[in-house]
């Protein structure tokens, strides 16, 4: 009897060792529902249909899948929830507190990072973070731009000076040509992006498609994610999954696949992740020399880049308004200093 028990225990230990050895790769799975506030529809349709759908579909998934975490950006959309759907908004707050619904992106609205001035970008983040802190008692730690058309050299510097530590996108994979004569479309999959002043943030440059879905799959053996993990630091990948443009939620089969894969025995350790978890896991970055560093801009060569030259009038008036806003603020500070009107801080 003792021999039988010893054999069983030995076999169990062997299986455990084998299982742990298999987990040499890691994948952060980030559930999302990219939501263009206004594209081929107006704001009213966004509020009446897409915003409401985003809330109720995710509520349904939360109640059925205990490890599911949803990531959603833009303080503007949360402000609409509060105004138009107060009951559902209270549920969103409950799920945020429980760690199931995660606010990401830091900004009032996901913005083009090339045309606006640095001051505009700072204000966008300031407004978003103040709203998140006031309404939910939390702040985001990242720049979350899955669907923008290139990223300027100032972005890591702005992010770092806003107290943010990470950035993610899936757009660079759309590039047609290799990056600046290199073999790949981007400098790295996951690494550190250095800005003009030497400030660095962690950057995920290939997060997969935000519309990625799974159909009752074992994601721990997913070949595409595994290949990305092999190219990442510490055999690590970061992967969006969900839907795009009109909000909503990941599909039911996708979330089922996630739950199933968390305890599966494939070579990938699957993590149901908040968008910024990977940055926190690697912070402080100085302790991780395995992270490659890129110093420069990250531009697109296809898709929406034509709008930067074709919309000259829009660029002109945007910059004019930025200058007028700056002048108005400076004048307000002078007026208050000289004993005139009180500075309109609201």
Q: Model-found features: residue ranges?
A:
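Bacterial Sec-dependent N-terminal signal peptides
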Residues: 1-22
């Amino acid at each position: 009897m003792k021999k039988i028990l010893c054999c069983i225990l030995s076999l169990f230990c062997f299986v455990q060792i084998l299982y742990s050895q298999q987990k040499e790769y890691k994948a952060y799975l980030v559930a999302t529902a990219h939501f263009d506030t206004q594209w081929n529809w107006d704001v009213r349709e966004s509020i009446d249909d897409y915003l409401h759908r985003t809330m109720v579909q995710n509520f349904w998934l939360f109640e059925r899948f205990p490890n599911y975490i949803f990531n959603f950006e833009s303080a503007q959309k949360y402000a609409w929830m509060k105004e138009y759907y107060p009951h559902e908004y209270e549920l969103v707050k409950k799920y945020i507190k429980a760690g199931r619904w995660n606010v990401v992106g830091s900004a009032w609205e996901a913005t083009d990072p090339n045309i606006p001035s640095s001051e505009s970008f700072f204000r966008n983040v300031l407004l978003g973070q103040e709203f998140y802190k006031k309404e939910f008692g939390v702040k985001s730690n990242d720049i979350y731009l899955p669907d923008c058309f290139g990223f300027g050299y100032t972005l890591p510097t702005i992010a770092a000076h806003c107290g943010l530590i990470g950035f993610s996108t899936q757009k660079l994979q759309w590039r047609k040509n290799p990056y600046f004569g290199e073999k790949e479309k981007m400098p790295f999959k996951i690494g550190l992006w250095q800005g003009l002043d030497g400030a660095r943030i962690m950057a995920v440059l290939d997060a997969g498609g935000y519309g990625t879905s799974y159909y009752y799959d074992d994601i721990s053996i997913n070949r595409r994610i595994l290949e990305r993990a092999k190219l990442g630091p510490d055999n690590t990948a970061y992967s969006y999954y969900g839907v795009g443009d009109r909000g909503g939620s990941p599909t039911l089969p996708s979330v089922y696949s996630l739950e199933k894969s968390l305890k599966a025995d494939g070579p990938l350790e699957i993590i149901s992740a908040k968008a910024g978890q990977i940055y926190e896991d690697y912070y402080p970055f100085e302790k991780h020399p395995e992270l490659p560093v890129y110093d420069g801009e990250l531009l697109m060569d296809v898709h929406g880049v034509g709008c930067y030259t074709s919309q000259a009038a829009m660029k002109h008036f945007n910059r004019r308004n930025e200058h007028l806003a700056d002048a108005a603020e400076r004048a307000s500070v002078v007026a208050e200093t000289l004993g005139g009107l009180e500075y309109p801080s609201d």
